[in-house]
Structure formats: structure tokens, C-alpha cells
């Protein structure tokens, strides 16, 4: 019987095509048979994504069943996996999460996952996420929910506490932190083996070793950090270096992420998210309009051309047919096909993995995926 995979929020131009590619490029899943259901609440969002899925399947020469629907129950009925990436009017509410706390003196780095803004972001996304999980309890109680939505660990914890559905959350922040370490050490990331744990968007590298020699790279990292100019690439490394010198471990993924969980971080992080509006024309929470914003993970966040080029029409066919590097497909390969995978970072209930955190708390830790889960 084919493996039914429901992509919830498939109309997203980042999540939908990349996850579709990963599924179609998975030889174990394709050989097992795939029934891929693209689900989004907005029908027009599905048009391009469904077209892309059929294009990619034909281009790759794989035979899978593809359908698109706006009906959540139809998508989940009999599913083996639900892969979810949703948000509620993201940028309008993010601008509110960012500015309203600042109005009352809460200086946030991002306002996405931590602090007052992160709390309201979580409360907005919890209701639809738990609704998805409760629908799964009725229609596919043995299925796994693979979540990409933020705030990652808060949503996964809501599902694990309030429903019986097995849930795992995924984030690529681990690789951002690994890239920082590789840059400082001058060693390619593929030659580094590192273990990190903590909560989503705030983990600590417990071990950093050279894959070939097995050498502990922390002594070299400390040496290279001390040698570096204190203000070099401050936006990217400043807060990390402060924490590293104080606690002896390198934090991950980046200051603009874990800075959300540190009250004083705003004093040491050059904000890489800025919403711009003229208050004389009304605040975004009054007008309902999304203000202009700049958002950057690296470099100068406010550097924009004087006369921006008009946006080009989105063509999903232009995306190369190669894996995204996310772990949803490997997890599905493990559970549905018994392929053993080593996963450097997943968000799951703690259950003793980190002894000084409660068992029911969702933590980000490395894991092994196999037929047992």
C-alpha cells in the first residue's frame, strides 16, 4: 500500500516545492509507493505547487500519485505522515509582535520565537497546529506529525501534551551554528562532527571533533576566538563570543536566534530584522497594513538598492531538482522503509535526554531514525 504523505501548508513557495523534491528524490519512498497530497486552505496557492509536483515527477521519471485539496480531513484520512508548515498572516502579525512589546519597553531581537512576541506567535499557531493533530487522532492516529512551523518547540510541546499524536519538529539552525564554527576554524563543515543540544534556536555544541582524526576541536576554537578582532563580524559572532567566554561552549544557531531568550541580548546584537513605517500614517496594528521590512541572516540588513529591480514571476521549474538538506524525507524513510539515519537535530519530548530539563519539555537533540521511530 502506498505511503500517504500529506503536506499541510503546501501552497508555501518555500516549503511546498522543496518538500516535494525531497519526497520525489527519495528512492526508498518512491520504491515503496507514494501518495502525495498537497493541502492548503487557499486553493489558488496550490495551483503552481501542484503543477510543479507533476513537472518534477515527470522530469525525474518517478511514478507517484499526486493530488491537491483544501480539505484537511481528506488530506489526513489514512495518512502515514503529515508534514506541516503553517503560519497565520505571518508578516503582518510579526510586525506587531516586534513593535508592540517595544512600545512597552521590551527590547526584542526578533520577536519570533522568544520574549513577548514569540509568546503571541506561539499562541496564534498553537490552535491550528493542535487542530491538525486532533484531526489526525480521528483519521490517522498512528501517523507522525513532522512540524516545520515556528515557534518550533512550543508547537511540538502543545501537540505532545494535548494529543496522542507522535510529533517531531525540524529546523536547520544546527547547520547555521556549524557553519560559524567551520568559518572560525578554517575547516570545511563536512570535515567536522559536532553534537548540539538545548531548545530550538538555543542549543550548545557539546562536542566538536575532526571527522578524520577524531581530534577535539574545542581547544583550537578557543585559540582562534581569542586571536580574532573583538568586533569582527559583530552582528554574526559578538553575542556568541560573549557566551562562549562565559560558559565554555559555542551556542547555536546565531545571535539573532538565541538572543531572543536572553533579556540583555538586544544590547549586543545588531538587529537583522527591521520593520519600517511612518507612525504619522498609523501603526501596523491599527491600519492592518504590513509595513516595509528588511530581514537578513547575514551581512548588512538595511542594504537595499536605490531602485530595486521589479520582482520576476515565480517559476518553480527553475529550482534545481536536488535535495533541500532538510530531514523530513530521511525521517519518513526511516519509519516507513526501515532505513537507518543519523539525525543531528530533531525537536522531540525530552524524556531524560537533557537531565536538567523537565521530561515533557520539547528539546532539540541528535537522534537515530529507524523503523521504530
Map each language-model feature to its residues.
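A short helix-to-beta-strand connector/capping loop
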Residues: 57-67, 190
Amino acid at each position: 500500500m502506498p505511503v500517504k504523505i500529506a503536506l499541510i501548508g503546501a501552497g508555501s513557495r518555500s516549503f511546498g516545492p522543496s518538500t516535494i523534491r525531497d519526497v520525489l528524490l527519495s528512492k526508498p519512498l518512491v520504491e515503496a509507493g507514494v501518495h502525495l497530497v498537497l493541502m492548503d486552505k487557499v486553493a489558488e496557492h496550490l495551483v503552481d505547487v501542484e503543477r510543479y509536483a507533476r513537472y518534477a515527477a515527470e522530469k525525474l521519471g518517478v511514478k507517484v500519485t499526486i493530488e491537491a485539496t483544501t480539505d484537511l480531513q481528506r488530506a489526513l484520512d489514512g495518512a502515514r505522515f503529515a508534514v506541516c508548515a503553517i503560519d497565520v498572516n505571518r508578516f503582518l502579525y510579526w510586525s506587531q509582535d516586534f513593535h508592540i512589546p517595544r512600545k512597552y519597553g521590551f527590547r526584542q531581537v526578533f520577536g519570533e520565537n522568544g520574549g513577548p512576541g514569540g509568546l503571541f506567535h506561539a499562541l496564534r499557531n498553537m490552535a491550528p497546529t493542535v487542530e491538525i493533530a486532533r484531526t489526525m487522532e480521528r483519521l490517522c492516529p498512528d501517523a507522525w506529525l513532522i512540524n516545520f512551523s515556528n515557534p518550533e518547540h512550543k508547537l511540538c510541546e502543545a501537540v505532545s501534551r494535548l494529543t496522542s499524536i507522535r510529533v517531531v519538529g525540524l529546523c536547520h539552525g544546527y547547520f547555521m551554528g556549524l557553519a560559524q564554527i567551520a568559518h572560525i576554524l578554517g575547516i570545511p563543515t563536512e570535515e567536522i562532527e559536532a553534537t548540539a543540544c538545548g531548545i530550538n534556536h538555543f542549543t550548545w555544541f557539546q562536542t566538536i571533533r575532526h571527522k578524520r582524526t577524531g581530534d577535539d576541536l574545542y581547544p583550537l576554537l578557543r585559540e582562534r576566538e581569542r586571536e580574532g578582532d573583538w568586533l569582527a563580524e559583530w552582528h554574526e559572532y559578538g553575542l556568541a563570543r560573549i557566551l562562549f567566554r562565559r560558559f565554555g561552549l559555542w551556542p547555536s544557531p546565531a545571535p539573532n536566534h538565541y538572543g531572543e531568550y536572553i533579556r540583555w541580548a538586544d544590547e549586543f546584537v545588531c538587529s537583522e530584522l527591521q520593520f519600517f513605517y511612518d507612525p504619522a500614517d498609523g501603526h501596523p496594528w491599527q491600519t492592518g497594513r504590513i509595513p516595509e521590512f528588511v530581514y537578513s541572516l547575514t551581512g548588512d540588513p538595511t542594504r537595499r538598492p536605490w531602485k530595486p529591480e521589479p520582482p520576476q514571476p515565480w517559476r518553480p521549474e527553475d529550482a534545481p531538482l536536488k535535495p533541500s538538506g532538510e530531514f523530513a524525507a530521511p525521517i519518513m524513510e526511516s519509519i516507513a522503509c526501515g532505513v537507518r539515519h543519523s539525525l543531528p537535530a530533531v525537536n522531540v519530548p525530552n524524556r531524560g535526554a537533557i537531565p536538567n530539563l523537565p521530561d515533557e519539555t520539547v528539546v532539540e537533540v541528535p537522534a537515530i531514525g529507524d523503523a521504530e521511530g
